[in-house]
């Protein structure tokens, strides 16, 4: 195995925490015959332990060795893989180097650990090659990655030669991409040890779809039209969804990533205190073959906050052209985002040499940077009842509409007033009562 791994070209720089290189070193020690049996066995168990951990995180099953090799191929963000993401393989000499590496991976797929197991009297490699995973709830592992990697693993098992192996891997790169950006829908921003912002995958995103959002058809239509244009590579605008709380603004944004993920849409959630990191985040993603929505939930600024200046600078752009694969989508309960005071409206007085009306204009100009503004208003009483009845049907609650509406009326009087959120909370309550009564 060590000889095989040492001959890799394109996939030579594997992730620092990979298991392939340590296992190759173990096999080299064994082949040389210069090893301590107990120490070598302990090293093997350490790598198998790591493999089991990875299998648990991603819900791998059956042949964990094959699953891991497939996972390694879709995780390596080398230049070849990145050029293939969302477009597939292009003609070029690099393909010959890729096929050279894939021939090696094909040999790794069929690598025989039996001699090692017999000599050390272990059976861990046999077990991981015919593994039966414990059935887990979806929230316990990343189902999105699990299904895709296991499907690729199965396809690679059936590849007859390096050409078929090449076709399987590059098709995966075309369909989904490579690395964490290819395998995950959404990300948050964290600070890496070096102080630079790092994109961290959100493994369990809310599985909401537009059919779950009752009402607001015009709003959803405008949002979808803008997003479809963006995903298709046409001109599109930054979007601001504003209006009353609990009306489905955030849910509408979340539904977008579930609808357009397979078409290359990715979402990055960012908070106000991270706005100063926006330039560095954009630098990390601007040359990737995906469409990115930078998502800001419940966006608003108080009079003393200046983070909006970072946001304006990013939206307006400086000397560098704003990347066409990035848009900003925000939700807010405020139409103008920034708290406006009567003091800002005073056109006569000056403060530190600046007219206060200029201050007001600077604050209010931020909303104008969003080319698409969509209002989500509080539903009427009739619309509220419709939402309640539709949600009840979706949950399988067989209750009379008149009864539902009467109870929904009582509920909203004590739980924040009329809104889609209030309706959902009411249905959750009824569902909980119904489930309890069945016990």
Whereabouts are the PLM-identified features?
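AAA+/P-loop NTPase substrate/partner-engagement loops
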Residues: 258-292, 299-304
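Conserved catalytic/switch belt of AAA+ P-loop NTPases
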Residues: 302-352
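N-terminal pre-Walker A segment at the start of P-loop NTPase domains
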Residues: 200-228
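Walker A/P-loop nucleotide-binding motif
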Residues: 234-253
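Conserved AAA+ ATPase "SRH/arginine-finger" region at the nucleotide-binding site
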Residues: 349-364, 371-385
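Intrinsically disordered, low-complexity N-terminal extensions of AAA+/P-loop NTPases
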Residues: 1-157
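Interdomain "pre-motor" coupling segment immediately N-terminal to P-loop NTPase/helicase cores
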Residues: 133-199
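C-terminal alpha-helical "lid" subdomain
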Residues: 373, 377-439
